[in-house]
Regions:
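Conserved mixed alpha/beta catalytic, RNA-binding, or beta-rich assembly cores of soluble enzyme
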Residues: 70-136
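Short terminal or interdomain "cap/linker" segment that borders an active site or interface and mediates
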Residues: 82, 129-205
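Conserved active-site and cofactor/substrate-binding residues in soluble primary-metabolism enzymes
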Residues: 24, 28, 110, 114, ...
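Short conserved micro-motifs at the rims of enzyme active sites and ligand-binding pockets
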Residues: 90-91, 205-208
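Active-site helix-to-loop segments that bind/position phosphate- or nucleotide-bearing substrates
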Residues: 1-96, 100
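Generic secondary-structure signature for well-ordered alpha-helical cores
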Residues: 31-38, 124, 128, 198-201, ...
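Feature targets compositionally biased, intrinsically disordered low-complexity regions
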Residues: 12, 125, 180-182
């Protein structure tokens, strides 16, 4: 399990150097995570359909996803999760020790992001094409409703135990689906936080 303490502190809203009490809390949360985090990952590679833009016969909606994929000819669909044990432990601590619960939630988020980065790097190492940073449903005008298609095409319930609620939320909560564009000339870094139109997100990274 790989953690990113800098990211954990950012998720906790810590600016500047953390105090000793905060560091001790994060260390406890990292220990908790070691016992309850069980990362799983799955992916599928598809040729990118044009006119209309589509993956696996499913149209992709929105101008932002079209712009993201303009220099791609293939698409990886990916999904990752930390499992239900992490969610159960977070929920338990939120009731019994709220500060630790919040810290564990932040640690798990950073672990999931680091895990996804590692898996995407492995995909890049196994590909002759350039891979773009991942792009998820809900970024820009790429609708969250396409989460249904991601879950269906990846068969996430059977493969990694990830399901979708009627409100389009993934379960377990610490789960992510995304697309990764691939192409010989693929380039661009206008994804992730930069692609999201939300201006008041507390977790939006500072971009220089």
């Amino acid at each position: 399990m790989k953690t990113n303490r800098r990211e954990t502190l950012r998720y906790l809203g810590v600016k500047g150097a953390p105090d000793e009490r905060t560091l001790a809390l994060v260390e406890r949360a990292e220990q908790e995570a070691e016992a309850c985090v069980f990362p799983r990952f799955t992916f599928r590679l598809f040729p990118l359909g044009r006119e209309p833009l589509s993956v696996g016969g499913t149209p992709l909606e929105g101008a932002d996803i079209a712009a993201y994929l303009k220099d791609c000819d293939e698409v990886y669909l990916i999904a990752a999760t930390l499992g239900f044990e992490a969610e159960k432990r977070i929920n338990f601590l939120m009731q019994s020790s709220p500060a630790l619960g919040v810290a564990l939630d932040a640690v798990c988020t950073s672990v999931l992001e680091s895990f996804l980065d590692e898996q995407c790097q492995k995909l890049q190492e196994g590909s002759k094409k350039r891979l773009k940073p991942r792009f998820s449903c809900g970024y820009g005008d790429f609708p969250l409703s396409q989460q249904r298609d991601m879950v269906r095409l990846l068969d996430t319930g059977r493969k990694i135990g990830v399901f979708l609620s009627e409100s389009l939320m993934l379960a377990p909560q610490k789960s992510v689906t995304a697309l990764v564009g691939a192409g010989e000339r693929a380039r661009g870094k206008s994804e992730g936080c930069l692609a999201c139109g939300k201006k008041d997100c507390a977790f939006k990274k500072e971009l220089k």
